[in-house]
Amino acid sequence: MNIKKFIVVVFLILSIKSYSQSWSPMSANNSIEKSYYIKKHNNSVGNTKVWVKLISNRIPYIDNNGVKKYTSGSELTLYNIDCNNSKIEIIKSILYDSSKKVIKTTEYNNWIDVAPETISEAILIKGCEIL
């Protein structure tokens, strides 16, 4: 195989891999007000990390002065998921306005038990499916 064909094959494989890692809807009933999407970040033994994207016209947040505000835009949250023990850890959250400007970045370090019929349970289930 000559070098040109090899480069084309490598490029095609990398393109397919990056396409397969696109955002997947969390549920079929995403609404106009709120839509959740999930994307695999990486795996470690027994755990997986996923990004969850929330798109909404009204995302609440606390500004630097402690005042509750709302923005139209998106929020990306990185989760560490322990599928064996039904726990999730929130690692980081990044809030963007509608023009993709970062409004707030927050880092966390806390594991939570997942309550039934919550967005946390949906993240756990979907995250463990893509493990």
Language-model segments: which ranges?
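Sec-dependent N-terminal signal peptides
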Residues: 5-14
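N-terminal secretory-pathway/extracellular module detecting exported/lumenal segments
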Residues: 19-75, 82-131
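N-terminal secretory signal peptides that target proteins for export/translocation
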Residues: 1-3
